Structures are given as C-alpha cells and as structure tokens.
C-alpha cells in the first residue's frame, strides 16, 4: 500500500504494518483503546506486557513520559544516536492508559530513524505502537511479502524496505541502563 493509504488506516484506528530499522512493526494509534485492542488480539499479546511507542521526534513521545522524573543525563540518553536501535523504558505519566503500559508504571519509547516512521508520524500527528510483525511462534517479518504471508494478502502494509539494523531494538532501563533485550 501507498503511504497515504496507510496514514488513512491509522487515522481510522486500524492496525497496519510498517518497516522499522530491522523488521516490520505492527502499529496503530496509541491514543485509541479500540485500535490497541485490535493489535493485541491480532498479535496474541497479553496486555500486561505493555507496548513500545516509536516516533521520529521527541515531541510525539512527551505526552507519555513523566518528564519530572528525568534529569538532563536521561534526556541525553534518550535522544542520542546509537549503533543499534535503542528503546528506553522511562517513567510513564499517570494518565497513560494500562493498555499501553501493561502491568508497569513505565513506558518503552524509541526515537526511530527509519523514513517510514518519520513520514507516518508526521502525517498522522501521533506516535505509533510498535511490536514486531509476526504471529506467535514465527520469526519477525523483514519484507512486506512476509507480512502478507503471515497476516493475509489484504493486510495493510507499507511497502518499503526495512533499515540496515540486523536485530530488533535493544531495550534498556533509562535509570539503571539494565538491558532487557539485546539489540
């Protein structure tokens, strides 16, 4: 599908697939409970796990982050470029719904450098949820065709290539720097 069609689907609170730095992600409007519920059902993902949010600029992630708990050094970590894509677990605002945070009082966020994410966020005006595009037990999709094979020929997928990263993003705690998933 073309970019404009994917943007329309996102604005209608539908779930789409889009390329990221290493694999295709399944995404939707994180402000829509119905969209996130569709995503969780499709992915067969428990709500307790929480979701990653991605955007091309920090402004779109700020509504989810409890800024009062972060120091300048944390902001530097969050905005710095890394050799591999890095998702940071940060304190969530109290207003962030549990369908985003899961069982946690934190939220996982990533500044994504992939042009598809930048274009989608720019045109929708919101961050995207990001969970790897794959059915339970299958490897994450690295091409639009793999997405169609797993989710059906008519699943809305942005037909662009993934980035050059080898693995999905590393996930780290902003305070302790603990690695939850290696990149």
Swiss-Prot record:
Gene3D superfamilies, A to Z: DHBP synthase
Gene this chain is encoded by: tsaC
PANTHER family given in the database record: SUA5 (PTHR17490), THREONYLCARBAMOYL-AMP SYNTHASE (PTHR17490:SF18)
Subcellular compartments: Cytoplasm
Record-listed E.C. numbers: 2.7.7.87
Chief place of localization: cytoplasm
Pfam families for this protein: Sua5_yciO_yrdC
YrdC-like domain mapped to chain residues: 1-183
InterPro entries membership: DHBP_synth_RibB-like_a/b_dom, Sua5-like_dom, TC-AMP_synthase, TC-AMP_synthase_SUA5
Protein known as: Threonylcarbamoyl-AMP synthase
Biological process terms in GO annotation: regulation of translational fidelity; tRNA threonylcarbamoyladenosine modification
Keywords linked to the UniProt accession: ATP-binding, Cytoplasm, Nucleotide-binding, Nucleotidyltransferase, Transferase, tRNA processing
GO terms under cellular component: cytoplasm
GO MF annotation, one: double-stranded RNA binding
Top-level taxon: Bacteria
Record family assignment: Belongs to the SUA5 family. TsaC subfamily.
Catalysed reactions, as listed in the record: L-threonine + hydrogencarbonate + ATP = L-threonylcarbamoyladenylate + diphosphate + H2O
Biological role stated in the UniProt entry: Required for the formation of a threonylcarbamoyl group on adenosine at position 37 (t(6)A37) in tRNAs that read codons beginning with adenine. Catalyzes the conversion of L-threonine, HCO(3)(-)/CO(2) and ATP to give threonylcarbamoyl-AMP (TC-AMP) as the acyladenylate intermediate, with the release of diphosphate.
């Amino acid at each position: 599908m073309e970019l404009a069609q994917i943007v329309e689907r996102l604005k209608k609170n539908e779930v789409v697939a889009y390329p990221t730095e290493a694999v295709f992600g399944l995404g939707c409007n994180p402000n829509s409970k119905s969209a996130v519920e569709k995503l969780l059902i499709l992915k067969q993902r428990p709500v307790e796990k929480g979701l990653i949010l991605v955007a091309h600029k920090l402004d779109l992630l700020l509504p989810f982050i409890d800024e009062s708990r972060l120091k300048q050094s944390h902001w530097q970590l969050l905005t710095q470029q890394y050799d591999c894509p890095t998702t940071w677990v940060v304190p969530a605002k109290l207003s962030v719904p549990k369908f985003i945070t899961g069982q946690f009082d934190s939220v996982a966020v990533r500044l994504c450098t992939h042009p598809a994410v930048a274009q989608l966020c720019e045109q929708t005006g919101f961050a995207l949820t990001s969970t790897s595009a794959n059915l339970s037990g299958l490897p994450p999709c690295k091409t639009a065709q793999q997405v169609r094979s797993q989710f059906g020929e008519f699943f809305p997928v942005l037909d662009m290539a993934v980035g050059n990263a080898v693995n999905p993003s590393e996930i780290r705690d902003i305070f302790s720097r603990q690695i939850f998933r290696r990149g």
